[in-house]
Design a protein with these regions (language model features):
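Glycine-rich phosphate-binding loop signature in dinucleotide/nucleotide-binding domains
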Residues: 56, 158-162, 363
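Metal-dependent amide/peptide-bond hydrolase catalytic core
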Residues: 46-51, 172-181, 186-188, 192-409
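Conserved hydrophobic/aromatic beta-strand scaffold that supports enzyme active sites
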Residues: 30-34, 166, 196, 290
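Fold-independent oxyanion-binding glycine-rich loops
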Residues: 25, 65-67, 88, 130, ...
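Acidic/histidine-rich catalytic neighborhood of metal-dependent amide-processing enzymes
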Residues: 91, 97-186
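Acidic/His- and Gly-rich active-site-bordering loop/insert found
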Residues: 1-94, 103, 113-122, 303
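Structural motif
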Residues: 60-62, 90, 164-166, 389-390
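Short, internal active-site loops enriched in acidic
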Residues: 27, 38, 130-134, 172, ...
Length: 409
């Protein structure tokens, strides 16, 4: 990681841009560079400024990506996964779509912004982190506690992100509906957690004289979880997602939205994968992922929990306490990070929409940006307390996220 950060720092230095690598562990760290606004609020208004621009000027724009990647088994790859082999217009390698490609895209945009000398109404930061794939203890989590220079006084990384707008990983892959390529933009994430139920035998213990009631109750708990339908909520992002795709299916009709009709139409034209994503964006889920039976006296049931933005720890505790009481079990919330939803229309995302139409549209085909709620989890989860608006967008041409990970040149 440090070698990659050093390389990025050299590129920035060649363009006269200062940056700093905040070392979080030997050979690991996070790089930050800044292009300051062309003016500051106390210096008066810039050209043609209005109240909306005044509000935006208070919020920095942060281009964020991570330089680390997950492991790769070379025998499963067509080309060595860390060789960045170029073949037939593609670059093959681990990280080409998660997220070295985003690092390159954001670095290029950052350099272009510095070179063209255009008026900037706010500070723009480039942040390249490490350790995202392993929990971010040495990455963004560590950076948030760093002290960084900012004008007249130093601030923490946490303060830097307060009320900021962030472009990070997530989305960018297109789905085709009619003659339109919709490039998905992650404007939110579901909350992610892990819950552990422990069901102990109530009656005689031991394999010879035991009643097996602990295991029986554990299996009933599993069946109960599997048949539950948790609360649902239609988020603004999801309503916009369904309505826009339905309009495209209907040939551009802009009539009154009907959620039931929208869902039915989309079910017919979307792929099975996209239908699953759409279903998940509309509901909370709890899924049993592991059953552990040390002995006949105790069974553990491990569950993955995905909650829509707006459902937090309090809702999760009420849900798990109810199940634990029903089946006479103990329950622990092992981990939980709250979800979030950023504004799905206007502002920064409006700028991304315009750029998508201009840069990715082709003859006979339209390109549009379409916000969605992700079921996965990334560094955006750390920014919920700071009320940052986080958008995951790294648009790519044809790509492959499996073994032989590759991105079009």
């Amino acid at each position: 990681e440090k070698m990659a950060l050093d390389y990025i720092q050299q590129i920035l230095e060649q363009e006269g841009i200062n940056s700093k690598i905040y070392e979080s562990a030997p050979g690991r760290g996070n790089l930050l560079a800044c292009l300051p606004a062309s003016f500051h609020m106390d210096e008066g208004a810039g050209p043609d400024r209005d109240s909306a621009e005044d509000e935006a000027a208070d919020r920095p724009l942060i281009l964020m990506s991570h330089i680390d990647v997950v492991l790769a088994k070379e025998s499963q790859w067509k080309h060595p996964p860390f060789a960045a082999v170029e073949e037939d217009g593609y670059i093959y390698g681990r990280g080409t779509v998660d997220t070295k490609q985003l690092t390159v895209m954001e670095l290029a945009a950052f350099l272009a912004l510095a070179e063209n000398g255009e008026y900037r109404k706010r500070d723009v930061f480039l942040l390249v982190t490490c350790d995202e794939e392993s929990g971010s203890a040495c990455g963004l989590s560590a950076f948030l506690e760093e002290t960084i220079p900012a004008g007249s006084r130093p601030i923490t990384g946490r303060e830097l992100f307060e009320n900021s707008e962030v472009i990070s990983e997530g989305g960018g892959f297109p789905i085709l509906v009619g003659d339109t390529a919709f490039y998905l933009c992650e404007s939110g994430q579901k909350g992610c957690g892990t819950v552990e139920f422990t069901v102990a035998a109530r009656l005689a213990k031991g394999p010879f004289f035991g009643s097996g009631d602990g295991m029986v109750r554990a299996m009933k708990l599993v069946a109960d979880i599997g048949s539950m339908e948790l609360e649902q909520r239609k988020l603004p992002t999801v309503a916009h997602f369904e309505q826009r795709l339905s309009q495209c299916v209907d040939g551009g009709s802009h009539g009154e939205p009907d959620a039931g009709q929208d869902a039915a139409r989309l079910g017919e034209v979307l792929s099975p994968v996209m239908n699953n994503i759409l279903t998940a964006m509309n509901r909370n889920t709890m899924t049993v992922t592991m059953i552990q039976g040390k002995n006949s006296s105790e069974v553990k049931v491990i569950c993955d929990v995905r909650l829509l933005p707006g459902y937090g720890t309090e809702y999760l505790k009420e849900l798990t306490d109810s199940l634990a009481e029903k089946w006479d079990a103990d329950c622990r919330i092992l981990s939980f990070s709250e979800g979030y939803e950023s504004q799905p229309e206007g502002g920064l995302i409006g700028c991304l929409e315009e750029a998508t139409r201009m840069e990715l549209g082709e003859a006979g085909k339209r390109a549009e940006l379409l916000p969605f709620i992700s079921m996965g989890s990334s560094d955006g989860r750390f920014l919920v307390p700071m009320k940052a608006k986080v958008y995951g967008y790294s648009p790519v041409l044809p790509w492959d996220m499996t073994f032989d990970q590759a991105v079009s040149m």
